[in-house]
Regions:
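N- or domain-start disorder-to-order transition segments that initiate the globular core
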Residues: 2-3, 7-42
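Extracytoplasmic
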Residues: 20, 40-44, 100-102, 200
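His/Glu-based metal-binding/catalytic segments typifying zinc-dependent metallopeptidases
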Residues: 34-39, 46-48, 230-245
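Solvent-exposed coil/turn segments that connect beta secondary-structure elements
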Residues: 38-39, 52, 75-76, 110, ...
Length: 245
């Protein structure tokens, strides 16, 4: 097991190429770019945002996952269906998921469509508008998702176990939130959450594919140069550990 872990660590480190704003991306503060070369014709890229359930305030339970849904529902220049079709039209895929510690927004595509994927990801991650009508729709979608989990004992038992272990700590919360809190969310709440966490200094951009690293950097400089230079990690989002049992 130890040898296997060492191999995984070695393989990851080989593809890890950090970007330091003062040297490369002087107009903003993208925390890292991770580039893993591959000979495959299919490539992947995305943003790993350092924000999950653990970072939610008491009145934001479920917000990290909620925002993950909402970023697909419209930006300043795209409607929801434009977002969904942008990669599907060239045989690509766009997806996301949330866990207790981070949110991943990513795309799979043929290598020649890297620019299209990167531009779309940048648009939804940094320029989502959170229309109130879409919030109301997604609230019902997520409540249905919660109810489906509650009908599945094998899933529910893990939530109960984490609640017991991390009692009183945000890590013990259900990633999906609770119906009562979800119904209170408004557009400005989603905007406030993303303003704290969805900035370059709090995320990593990752690329896997047959792409030159310098090409990736050029695209990053082009697409991210106009973003505000907010550096580092948000304050007040980490919590002292305490045993639940």
């Amino acid at each position: 097991m130890k040898r296997q872990n060492e191999e995984v660590k070695r393989e990851f480190t080989v593809g890890f190429q950090p970007i330091y704003p003062a040297q490369r991306l002087s107009h903003h503060s993208l925390n890292r770019i991770i580039h893993e070369p591959s000979a495959s014709k299919v490539a992947y890229c995305g943003f790993a945002v350092d924000a999950g359930t653990r970072d939610e305030l008491e009145n934001e339970q479920g917000m990290a996952h909620f925002v993950e849904h909402l970023i697909f529902k419209g930006t300043a220049k795209r409607k929801a269906w434009h977002i969904l079709n942008r990669m599907e039209n060239v045989g690509g895929d766009l997806n996301a998921y949330t866990n207790k510690e981070e949110t991943m927004i990513y795309s799979a595509f043929l290598t020649e469509h890297f620019g299209r994927a990167f531009e779309l990801l940048t648009d939804i991650v940094f320029h989502s508008t959170f229309p109130q009508r879409e919030i109301e729709k997604e609230t019902e979608v997520i409540i249905d998702e919660i109810q489906s989990y509650e009908d599945n004992p094998s899933e529910l038992i893990f939530d109960d176990f984490e609640d017991l272990i991390f009692r009183g700590h945000p890590l013990g919360r259900n990633i999906l939130g609770n119906p009562g809190q979800l119904k209170l969310f408004r557009s400005e709440d989603a905007a406030a959450f993303t303003s704290r966490f969805y900035h370059p200094g709090n995320m990593v951009f990752f690329v896997l594919g047959n792409l030159d690293f310098r090409q990736v950097v050029r695209w990053a400089e082009k697409l991210l140069a106009d973003l505000p230079a907010v550096a580092g990690y948000p304050s007040g989002t980490r919590h002292d550990w305490q045993p639940g049992i």
